Amino acid sequence: MAPAAPTVLVVEDDPVILRLLEVNFDLEGFNVLLAQDGEEGIAVARAKRPDVIVTDIMMPKVSGLELVETLKADADTASIPIVLLSAKAQSGDLRAGVDAGADDYVTKPFEPLDLIDRVNALLSR
């Protein structure tokens, strides 16, 4: 019996990037869940318990940093690895992401397959 495909939750308010990530993760064998803002991302994460989350930082309603802090503070979702994806590339931005509890930080623009490699590395830990 083949192992179950990992499930990734992609949280991104830009529909073009959301679709790009959906297609690439799907092509690499992931089950893909989608959310268009941080509030929806938190709800989907709690309901579906994905294996990993990739989230933008700057989003309406709830930011990616708030999403990370909320999910890492919840015993039911604290162990889910989270990758922050952002156009913010200053060292202070990276520090804020790590301080919030993110497991990795990828800056835009990015190569989708490089991001997927980093996600796979997190899943293999």
Predicted regions and their residues:
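C-terminal output helix
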Residues: 110-120
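Charged docking surfaces used in two-component/phosphorelay signaling
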Residues: 19-27
